[in-house]
Design a protein with these regions (language model features):
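An acidic, low-aromatic, low-complexity terminal/linker signal
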Residues: 1-192
Length: 192
């Protein structure tokens, strides 16, 4: 064991994260919440979809709502490139795809190298942030995946998913026209 590994052990439990870039900042997500990282693909836009949803993709038969983190974080839109990735994550037992500018690597940050979030980190409110990890000469903003979406947005996603399942033809959604929930469906849902 080298001195760096001993130092990491002394700092406590290692946090394994997928690191990625949005705008000028590097972020990290708990690797256990990430299902996979894929290249950007065609996103099917949905009429009347909630504003935070870019659209949906079909990933091996699963319809996954897509959220662009640039939009979510209030950053200027940027055309997708060959480095653009979709990180598929589990949010409250639902798969959601998050578009990022680039996915970097798996990083390990000792618990002792993670500080509480500052009042504002990378222009983000601390509601999304779990902490800031120090890794060599850089800082990684650790996102709290459960707070990326508000409770209202999670309800909207569930309604959208229900509507998609109800309108999907037998045999799946491949090639089918899919509609987002109408305002009537949204308004007739249970109050939260």
């Amino acid at each position: 064991m080298d001195s760096k590994e001993r130092h990491m052990e002394a700092d406590g439990e290692l946090n394994q994260l997928i690191s990625f870039v949005v705008g000028e900042e590097e972020y990290g997500l708990d690797i256990l919440r990430v299902k996979e990282v894929i290249r950007i693909r065609e996103i099917t836009r949905l009429p009347k979809a909630p504003g935070f949803v870019k659209g949906i993709i079909n990933l091996r038969g699963d319809v996954i709502p897509i959220i662009d983190l640039r939009d979510k974080f209030g950053l200027e839109h940027q055309e997708y490139t060959t480095t653009t990735r979709v990180i598929v994550v589990d949010v409250d037992d639902k798969l959601v795809g998050m578009v990022v500018d680039a996915a970097s690597q798996v990083v390990r940050i000792p618990a002792g190298q993670i500080d509480p979030p500052p009042p504002i980190a990378g222009g983000l409110s601390t509601e999304y942030i779990r902490g800031v990890g120090k890794l060599d000469d850089r800082l990684v903003i650790l996102l709290n995946i459960n707070r990326i979406l508000t409770q209202e947005e999670k309800v909207e996603l569930r309604k959208m998913e229900k509507s998609i399942k109800e309108t999907a033809p037998p045999g799946g959604t491949e090639g089918a026209e899919i509609q987002a929930p109408t305002e009537e469906l949204v308004l007739s849902g249970d109050a939260t």
